[in-house]
Regions:
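Intrinsically disordered terminal tails
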Residues: 1-35, 44, 51-62, 92, ...
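Signature of small four-pass
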Residues: 31-45, 49, 63-124, 143-164
């Protein structure tokens, strides 16, 4: 009788350990790695759009709407990534459903921002100013391309978060 109770206790103890430690193996490191990559993309995009958005006096490289959309996309998701990573350091968990919603929102916003930045780049390229300021146009094109990469990172992070959340590996 005592041995069957211990067997049940062992199974219960394993379940408690899984709940306590939340996830095991590599799966607990996947979301923070995505957040680090997303944070790096946001920092680089902010650096790339700063010059074409703010330092062009005579020629407009980016419209005010595109600049506002870019800053209001990159900065908040940069802050959210920092908060997420800071929470991981303090061992606080973000619910996977909330994280999935934020990833979906970030994917949509990054895609819209990339479309606007590349649209402004295309319009500036087709104006045929001579001599063209290719450095600012390269910064703008690079920011648009990195915004697409950021959107793909958020999409992959969304898929991974949903899969791990449904499996129960993350809360």
């Amino acid at each position: 009788m005592a041995s069957t109770e211990q067997g049940g206790t062992d199974q219960t103890d394993r379940g408690l350990r899984k709940d306590y430690f939340n996830s095991s193996g590599v799966t607990k490191f996947i979301p923070p790695v995505f957040k680090l990559l997303e944070m790096a993309v946001a920092i680089i995009c902010i650096g790339l759009i700063d010059d074409p958005a703010n330092n062009s006096r005579f020629r407009v490289f980016m419209t005010a709407r595109t600049t506002a959309l870019a800053y209001s996309t990159f900065v908040p998701f940069l802050i959210l990534s920092v908060i997420y990573l800071f929470g991981k350091v303090l061992r606080e968990n973000v619910p996977w459903k909330l994280q999935s919603l934020l990833n979906l929102t970030a994917f949509i916003m990054y895609l819209a921002t990339a479309a606007c930045i590349l649209s402004d780049w295309s319009e500036t390229k087709n104006r045929n100013y001579w001599p063209p300021n290719t450095q600012r146009m390269d910064f703008q094109c690079g920011a648009g391309a990195l915004a697409i990469i950021g959107a793909l990172l958020y999409l992959i992070d969304l898929v991974v978060t949903v899969r791990l959340g449904i499996k129960g590996d993350i809360e």
